[in-house]
């Protein structure tokens, strides 16, 4: 008995995806998505380095 008999003989390979043709609309859509992602990343970066949004603290009444 060899150790290989129990296993699969050939590895399973996924079929290669065909290169799809992209028209102008697809190219424009991809470009727009990239720009939106860049803007989102920039907004995240700006928000992460900021401090607290509200400076309210503990509210005090005027009564003593």
From Swiss-Prot:
Annotated region described as Disordered, given as residue ranges: 1-64
Keywords, ordered alphabetically: Coiled coil
Domain of life the protein comes from: Eukaryota
InterPro entries xref list: TMA7
Basic and acidic residues bias locations: 27-44
Similarity section: Belongs to the TMA7 family.
Protein name: Translation machinery-associated protein 7 homolog
Lineage of the species this protein comes from: Eukaryota, Metazoa, Ecdysozoa, Arthropoda, Hexapoda
